[in-house]
Structure formats: C-alpha cells, structure tokens
From Swiss-Prot:
SUPFAM superfamilies reported for this sequence: Ribosomal proteins S24e, L23 and L15e
Protein name according to UniProt: Large ribosomal subunit protein uL23
Subunit-structure text: Part of the 50S ribosomal subunit. Contacts protein L29, and trigger factor when it is bound to the ribosome.
Biological process per Gene Ontology, one example term: translation
Entry keyword annotation includes Magnesium: no
Keywords: Ribonucleoprotein, Ribosomal protein, RNA-binding, rRNA-binding
InterPro entries in the cross-refs: Nucleotide-bd_a/b_plait_sf, Ribosomal_uL23-like, Ribosomal_uL23/eL15/eS24_sf
Disulfide links within the chain: none
Domain of life: Bacteria
A Pfam family that the UniProt record links to this protein: Ribosomal_L23
Purpose: One of the early assembly proteins it binds 23S rRNA. One of the proteins that surrounds the polypeptide exit tunnel on the outside of the ribosome. Forms the main docking site for trigger factor binding to the ribosome.
Gene3D superfamilies (UniProt xref): 3.30.70.330
Molecular-function GO terms, alphabetical: rRNA binding; structural constituent of ribosome
Length: 108
C-alpha cells in the first residue's frame, strides 16, 4: 500500500523566522567549498522540510538535502558563577550542482 503525498503549506512569516543566521567560520567555509553546502543557525523546533522551503524562498536556490544537528550549550564560568551557553541547532544545507549562495551582499 503506497501513501499519498502529504501537501505541506507554510506561511511566509514562519519561514522567515526559521533561519536565524548563517554560520560563517573557517570550518563552514571549507565545508561549503568541498561539498557545496551552507551552514545556518535555525530555530530549535524547525524541521528539515521547513528549512529547505525557507532557503529556497529566501535565496531563490535549489536545495538538494538538509542535515541538522543539535549542539548542547557549553558550561562556562562568568566571573565566579557557572552558567551555560544556549543550545544550538545547526542546518547543513546541500545545494544542487550549479547553485551558489552569496552572503557578501554583491549580486552573483
């Protein structure tokens, strides 16, 4: 028995909130060059499907796949007190061949 495809509709307001910020670091840049991937900090409750739809809507590119990871916040000392940084959810977005994302603000 095959399942019928589930139609998913997202509001543009929700999709605009899903992507919190791009992660631009040395590691993220090397991953982007090797595997044609882009890293984003996303909401804790964001799904892979929402992330894919948000990237395609905001940047007008085609997404091949999305992998996510949940990173626990580090325990750090602030003065004499111990605290914890916030937990983080990262999305590794693989772009289809020939697609490119540019964060510098210049037209590609």
């Amino acid at each position: 028995m095959s399942r019928a495809p589930i139609s998913r509709t997202f509001t543009e307001g929700r999709l605009a909130q899903v992507l919190v910020a791009p992660i631009i670091s040395e590691k993220a840049t090397s991953i982007g060059e090797k595997h044609n991937q882009v890293l984003f900090k996303v909401l804790q409750d964001a799904t892979k499907i929402e992330i894919k739809a948000a990237v395609e809507l905001m940047f007008k590119v085609e997404v091949e796949s999305v992998q996510v990871l949940n990173q626990k916040g580090k325990t750090k000392r602030f003065g004499g007190r111990t605290g914890r940084r916030d937990h983080l959810r990262k999305a590794y977005v693989s772009l289809k061949a020939g697609q490119e994302l540019n964060f510098s603000g210049e037209a590609a």
